[in-house]
Amino acid sequence: MEPGQCEIARLPEEILSAALSRTSPRDACRAAAVSPAFRAAADSDAVWACFLPPPADLPPLADGELLLPPRGKKGLFLRLSGSPALLPGGLSMWLDRESGAKCYMVPARDLSIAWRDTPRYWTSWIHLADSRFPESAQLRLDRRSSRRPTAGAISGAVLLAYANYMVYKLDDESYGLDWPADASVSIGGTDLARKVCLQPNPQRSHAEDVVLPRERGDGWMELELGEFVCEGDEDGDVSFGLAETKRLNGKGGLIMQGIEIRHKN
């Protein structure tokens, strides 16, 4: 060993693996650059199996999502955290890169949307090249806007915080969406509500408690509708709602891809 070389690198690989498995995916990747001994431990299945959900908690993926099986547990983690994978039921799923928590996106087609099949209010379902799903919902004319999406069973580790986000776009002729709407989240008999705004008007000031959208890196916008906490390992039902029924003005130009349910760091 050369002078100044890290003594910890002389530890057996199984001890290094046990220590790294108690850190985070980011820390394990950083440790791999320390030395060959660290790299062997940091890239091992023993470490990355601890960052992945248990096999029984990983839902089956849709056909064709893993054409080339990943190399080892680290490869599987990087695949599932690098981009969403479609599930057989139409949802998409990915892993949070920091915590390994499962995240989901529910497509607009699976949401309960008022008058969704009435052409007067909603155009036919449209396809956008930058959407994860074959169809997105486009609002044409709505005198009363109401959406109540429901994501079925959500399971997580003790005290895992999640938030749900509406992912959408506004076309060049959007209108009537600059007034605060009522968003809600319900889980385990607890209902939480907040005010949100889909299209802030720069000429109008909003109350401090009104949640505003932000632009995403993929060209869409997202609006946080609420958050909740998973306690324990039992599954539970969580539902989300968005409604604006006080101002009966027309609304249009909203294109909705779906609802994301993400771990909140």
Regions found by a protein language model. Name each.
Residues 3, 10, 14, 18, ...:
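Plant-skewed but cross-kingdom recognition/interaction modules and surfaces
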Residues 29:
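Short, basic-rich loop-to-helix N-cap that marks the start of a DNA-contacting helix
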